[in-house]
A protein has these predicted regions:
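Conserved polar/disulfide-associated segments of primarily extracytoplasmic proteins
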Residues: 60-147
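Bacterial N-terminal signal peptides that target proteins for export
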Residues: 1-8
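N-terminal targeting sequences that direct proteins away from the cytosol to non-cytosolic compartments
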Residues: 14, 20-73, 114, 137, ...
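Generic N-terminal leader/processing signal
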Residues: 4, 17-20, 31, 96, ...
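Alpha-helix N-cap/helix-start motif
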Residues: 1, 87, 164-168
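Charge-rich, low-complexity amphipathic helices
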Residues: 1, 120, 124, 189-197
Length: 198
């Protein structure tokens, strides 16, 4: 039986799902409080994605949803490569998978790859998506994809607008794949790093 436990470590709060006493990686993202936001880690198999949410105004809604600042939210997810039906370019396959999803549900979908937000990195892709309903109402988001062995870690930031670009760049610069298990020892290491940043 899973339960969400809050473990208080010296100077840090970690949200960590506990499964009995087994030493399995957590299924949900974990967050470690820092002096200027949160360090996050989301495990899948024997690797995890790490990223930073900068800003003391950032508020965790649950393990998968974060209010980054007033009017700007983020969702954290993982898409298995089996869903993408393309083993070659996982990042492009993921972007197309998202676009196809919205084409089935919206009147109009526009997408644009935002290389200006990723810099020279090839392991990350930012796709800006605008979705319109039949009344012309628009929702927009940035999909930040990080290629992994078994799929794509995704940070979805909404709304997509020019004044959110610097925030997306910060997320991209911190979004890294770590080829280690997110076990108790690694979690302790992350907590110690966060404490040192305080």
């Amino acid at each position: 039986m899973k339960r969400l436990a809050q473990l208080l470590l010296p100077g840090a709060l970690i949200l960590l799902p506990i499964k009995g006493v087994q030493a399995e990686p957590p299924e949900d993202p974990i967050y470690v409080k820092t002096s200027d936001g949160w360090n996050a880690a989301y495990a899948h198999g024997d690797e995890y994605a790490g990223f930073r949410v900068i800003g003391n105004g950032a508020k965790l809604q649950d393990a998968y949803h974060i209010l980054l600042q007033k009017g700007v939210g983020m969702m954290v997810s993982f898409v298995d490569k089996k869903e993408l039906q393309n083993d070659g370019d996982l990042l492009s396959a993921h972007a197309q998978w998202e676009i196809d999803y919205w084409h089935q549900r919206a009147s109009k979908v526009e997408s644009n790859t935002r290389e200006d937000l990723t810099g020279t990195r090839k392991d990350v892709k930012v796709t800006e998506i605008k979705v319109y309903n039949d009344k012309g109402t628009r929702i927009s988001s940035y999909l930040i994809g990080l290629a992994a062995k078994d799929g794509v870690f995704v940070l979805s930031v909404s709304p997509a607008q020019k004044d959110v670009d610097p925030l997306v760049k910060e997320l991209v610069s911190s979004f890294k794949l770590v080829p280690r298990n997110l076990d108790a020892e690694e979690t302790k290491r992350l907590s110690s790093e966060a404490k040192a940043q305080r």
